[in-house]
Amino acid sequence: MFELNNFDALQIGLASPEKIREWSRGEVKKPETINYRTLKPERDGLFCERIFGPMKDWECHCGKYKRIRYKGIVCDRCGVEVTKAKVRRERMGHIELAAPVSHIWYFKGIPSRMGLILDMSPRALEKVLYFASYVVLDPKETPLLKKQLLNEKEYRESIDKYGDDSFVAAMGAEAVKTLLDEIDLEQSSIELKEELKTSTGQKKIRIIRRLEVVESFRKSGNRPDWMVIDVIPVIPPDLRPMVQLDGGRFATSDLNDLYRRVINRNNRLKKLLDLGAPDIIVRNEKRMLQEAVDALIDNGRRGRPVTGPGNRPLKSLSDMLKGKQGRFRQNLLGKRVDYSGRSVIVVGPELKMYQCGLPKEMALELFKPFVMKKLVQNGLAHNIKSAKRMVERVQPQVWDVLEEVISDHPVLLNRAPTLHRLGIQAFQPVLVEGRAIKLHPLVCTAYNADFDGDQMAVHVPLSVEAQAEARFLMLAAHNILKPSDGKPVSVPTQDMVLGSYYLTMDKDGVKGEGKVFSCPEEVLMAYQCKAVDIHAKIKVRLKKVIDGETIEGIIETTPGKIIFNESIPQDLGYIDRTIPENKLKLEVDFLVSKKTLGGIITKCYMKHGATKTSIMLDKIKAKGYHYSTIGAITISTSDMVVPESKRELLENTEKQVEKIQKMYRRGFISEEERYEKVIDLWTKTTEDVANALMESLDSFNPIYMMADSGARGSKSQIKQLAGMRGLMANPSGKILELPIKASFREGLDVLEYFISTHGARKGNADTALKTADSGYLTRRLVDVSQDVIVRQEDCGTEEGYEVSEIKEGNEVIEPLVERLSGRYPSEDIIHPTTGEVIVKRNTYMDEDIAQKVSDAGIKKVKIRSVFTCKSKHGVCARCYGMNMGTSQKIHIGEAVGIVAAQSIGEPGTQLTMRTFHTGGVAGADITQGLPRVEELFEARKPKGLAIVSEVSGTVKMEETKKKRTIIVVTDDGEEVSYDIPFGSRIKVKNGDIISAGDEITEGSINPHDILRIKGVDGVKNYLLSEVQKVYRLQGVDINDKHLEVVIRQMTRKIKIEDSGDTELLPGTMIDVFDFEEANREILEKGGEPAVGRIALLGITKAALATDSFLSAASFQETTRVLTDAAIKGKIDPLLGLKENVIIGKLIPAGTGMTRYRSIQINTDDENIEEDSMDSMEV
């Protein structure tokens, strides 16, 4: 039996008239919808019950048969089958057209498929279809040509000249249908291939296009004449509903209006034909019918759209699929789910890392069926119905049952926008009073949540499998690392950091300094009795049992550090425990800031795993809050101390500025230089004031503590509060030379305030724009890489990708260690001096090994990379390396494509929107930030192009009055010269040796040039390092492998240049692996292989070029994708995630992969692995 969800692929094609009649349950003959008096559908109308099924369950139209017992009977009076009303969602009808009409998608799309296959221009075709010209179908003996157009006058003249039956010419879709019918696809294909061999230029391009369409029809088994419609399918009435409003009026779907126009015109045409009306009237009616069908299929594609009341264009069938509100994105990819709720969030500092507070009433509603089942099980209710009543009346015993149900049932919390996979995590719910969800403070960073009114959604995983996945994979306590760079995401923030910082400070000359205590417990007692200050330097005798022997000794520390170290495992590697005198030292014996806390968490995670780390985090959280409260660290204006040296510094600078102005007035320096110098002076002064300020602040100054610990604020903010605000930019980004000399503490005057507002407003406008742009970039990234899944352990490739550190000038942007850790080398790494093998090929390198390689002085290493992975679909685990989110080796089934897209898209909002203005008249604006990332991923020609050397060789410079020229001399003496426009900065010097693809002037390079000069490896390298530069400059770390995944998708297609003996068409794009496959097959038969070269596609193009038409159609340009797919009879193999979500199957990643599908889960055993919650209750 065919199960609706049990198929492996999906094919799309053109529907033949026979097929449409086969789908249909009857012909719709009348434009009537519903009788407004009886509110019953009219017979043979658009809502007819005889065609589409009954309006009410088990009830025919006339009421002769009611109730389920007559199931399946067709009423003899009204002809309605007695069945469920749901069939009105699936039964189709049809309209028999009195004259054929063309399908607008195939006639009007770009390129016009109908025009290509007939070799007519779309313009000529339009004249024929809309009855403006005749087309010659059969010239017989006359000198006319086949497919020649004749207007009314020429047609009459030809008839007079050659006689009535001397030739055949016609107009309208009938004529086109006849022409399409006559096409012999096999013959056309052979002729076009012959022509292709001899043609060049524009003609060649046109032939390739035509050949593509002809081949599509030939291979798919679609017939060209099916592009002309004889029968129109009518979609089921419940998909185009009509409902009665309060006032007795009806609201209806636009489709009904469009269908009604088609039926009206069709019926009128039938009548005219029966009456034998004059040709001109019939012709006009046929044209109107053609236009009505066009509007139904795609309103507004040709001519003015048909409008409804209030001049609103009606929504046609195409509009139902298109865009954010269309079927694909609104209903198939974005479904609403049951068992969910949302509420405002408040902070829950008392929660454990894996808990969240769930409001009682919300929990009761969410877990209703579970509670009802439990009530019956516990004998508190006799049946489900009475249990339901108990829950709805909220009787007291319901709450105890709810507690029981909830105790081992995780829930998912989600905050929109979900920018990365940490935007949905699982928690163990704890019932709370009130109506707000309580959230653990440490997961706020991952959700990017704060408590100023944010809302979050709750979802309940229902099945046992879903609960298990939520508990073992999605529990917040297991998601401590960020998938984008493997650094911890649950780092304490704000108060917690401040409290930890305060605890680990020390101070001279406070109460109890120098005292000696017999044990840590005594220190705590002394502190609680206020006999010793928390920051006092004291000595304590410690005892420890190590390997069975007891060691004791005295260490110097503070009470605060003892308290802080209680919650830290004492073996994180901060202290070398092999040295005897270090054995008793406290692990964290330094001032703790946000940065060092991050380090402590990383070390703990690497050494002890997630469970222990989350326990440690909870302890740090509790201590941090407690001591930042006790420490009473708070801000007041008296903490903002204006440095005394400020006035003197300002006066000095003003004198120097005056000197510079004098020099300018005397003509010693240019306007440019004067501006540069003034800006430099003020920048330096601002710095000096800031430094003076930082020096003058006491280390116990609350504002200083907040900034220094990383809890809130930064040096630049303190500088503005108590130093001076400094230079400001105007909206276009130019720096004004009038600095703001005041600080906020002193107060700004009117002019200063006005200058400040400029920047502030631009910042706000920028942020709003950036969010939208960043979201759209993420969407495109997800679409291009969504089908990349780890599908095998090892693809067996011998190739590798050479990495070295990424530099910008002299500054290292990404060190080698970072590029190596978590990877496999593709060849043995040998120590350059000792010659020993440090790492064998295909051996996993962790951070320590990577550090070893780097320390050995090795600069370049060949590693296994996603770039060189040979897996046809997805990637293999070896080429991918480490899973950044768990710092383990990646598992098969991990959706690495989506993780990559999220990792690149999520920090998008942090990137700036700005364009830097470099000095100089012709100084090109260098794009940076988000626009630069977008430019790279879309493989666009960048603004501010650099000149690139096409050849390798030595640089020779020549300068004349008119122009500057750079000549590159190759090794065999050939010279290539480049003219340098004025205003561009040259990057090379005379006598430099450069290689092909190096830039001669500053600026960005067009990636397509790099592909041409340096090949595909060069362009991959360039894109990777350029994107990394943008992100690193903003302080965002993204692991290379995420960028590799996306860039690999951009370089997967080959453009065929010569087809050889293969079936491939020149000029078409084909997947690298399919190309190699086709060539392998031809070579085995002894034929000539195809020749092609790698094409670099931007992410939008690459996403549309995917094998899956469902994924492409749901992304962009829906109609174009579907038109193309239908002609080609494309088969969607359902390999990606999106297409499976669309048709409602499990996604082929994680436990949804086919290899896990057949696993049976036995649920009789109640304790699934001693519930992971208990193990965390340590």
Swiss-Prot record:
It comes from the Bacteria. It catalyses: RNA(n) + a ribonucleoside 5'-triphosphate = RNA(n+1) + diphosphate. InterPro entries: DNA-dir_RpoC_beta_prime, DNA-dir_RpoC_beta_prime_bact, RNA_pol_asu, RNA_pol_N, RNA_pol_Rpb1_1, RNA_pol_Rpb1_3, RNA_pol_Rpb1_3_sf, RNA_pol_Rpb1_4. CDD domains: RNAP_beta'_C, RNAP_beta'_N. Keywords: DNA-directed RNA polymerase, Magnesium, Metal-binding, Nucleotidyltransferase, Transcription, Transferase, Zinc. Its EC number is 2.7.7.6. DNA-dependent RNA polymerase catalyzes the transcription of DNA into RNA using the four ribonucleoside triphosphates as substrates. The RNAP catalytic core consists of 2 alpha, 1 beta, 1 beta' and 1 omega subunit. When a sigma factor is associated with the core the holoenzyme is formed, which can initiate transcription. NCBIfam families: rpoC_TIGR. This is DNA-directed RNA polymerase subunit beta'. The lineage of its organism: Bacteria, Bacillati, Bacillota, Clostridia, Eubacteriales.
